[in-house]
């Protein structure tokens, strides 16, 4: 298939909330898509991805991210486009922060790879990829599926569930931002962005694209890479 996508559909009984059936569908060309993402977003900072074919272990990490995201959908998690919007941009160049949190607090965000990291950052220990699971994801799954044995009815669960929400309400790691379609009214809930300052983040991204355009022929000139070079130019 030439489709570059994956899905995590599920069938849910509206009477009980029980997930009756769920599956993860992965189209073949997702392999090419995740390679594009990794190359175009992180090649300036990562010598290991400066090729048209990713090393198997690196490609496996990229696919694992996609699969984890889709499994999240099968478990009823919606897109959380606020996953990275509360992270200070400079924290995404900080080794300690990125090793703990990656690029986002939720893999249900569209926060792919760390395009803010600059050449030399990886050598300092900066992580360039999303987390396996984010703080929000662990919390959301716990909220959805932790048994509340003291509650005898669904109605009795509500105060406890509300309490769990209140306990995290002041912590930006657990913020949720609904995906916006057609019109964007909330700048903190946007696809494909990183960090809390879009101007600063875009400036770092621009520097990386300039670096990539300057060196791309040195990295892949002897390969069949028309798509890579044209995407970089676009």
Where are these predicted regions, by residue range?
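Conserved catalytic/binding loops enriched for acidic/polar residues
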Residues: 84-86, 90-230, 234
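Acidic, metal/ion-coordinating pockets
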Residues: 81
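Metzincin-family zinc-dependent endopeptidase catalytic domain
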Residues: 1-74, 78, 99-103, 113-116
């Amino acid at each position: 298939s030439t489709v570059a996508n994956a899905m995590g559909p599920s069938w849910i009984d509206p009477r009980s909330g029980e997930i009756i059936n769920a599956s993860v569908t992965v189209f073949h060309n997702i392999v090419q898509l995740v390679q594009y993402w990794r190359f175009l977003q992180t090649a300036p900072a990562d010598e290991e991805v400066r090729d048209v074919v990713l090393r198997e272990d690196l490609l496996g990490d990229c696919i694992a991210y996609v699969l984890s995201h889709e499994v999240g959908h099968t478990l009823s998690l919606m897109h959380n486009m606020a996953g990275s919007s509360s992270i200070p941009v400079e924290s995404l160049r900080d080794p300690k922060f990125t090793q703990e949190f990656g690029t986002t607090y939720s893999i249900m965000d569209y926060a792919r790879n760390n395009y803010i990291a600059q050449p030399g950052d990886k050598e300092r220990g900066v992580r360039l990829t999303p987390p396996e699971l984010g703080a929000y994801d662990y919390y959301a799954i716990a909220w959805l599926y932790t048994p509340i044995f003291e509650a005898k009815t669904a109605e009795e669960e509500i105060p406890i569930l509300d309490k769990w929400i209140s306990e995290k309400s002041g912590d930006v790691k657990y913020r949720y931002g609904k995906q916006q379609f057609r019109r964007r009214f909330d700048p903190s809930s946007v696809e494909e962005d990183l960090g809390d300052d879009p101007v600063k983040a875009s400036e770092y991204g621009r520097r990386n694209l300039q670096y990539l355009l300057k060196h791309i022929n040195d990295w892949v000139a002897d390969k069949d890479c028309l798509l890579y070079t044209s995407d970089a130019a676009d």
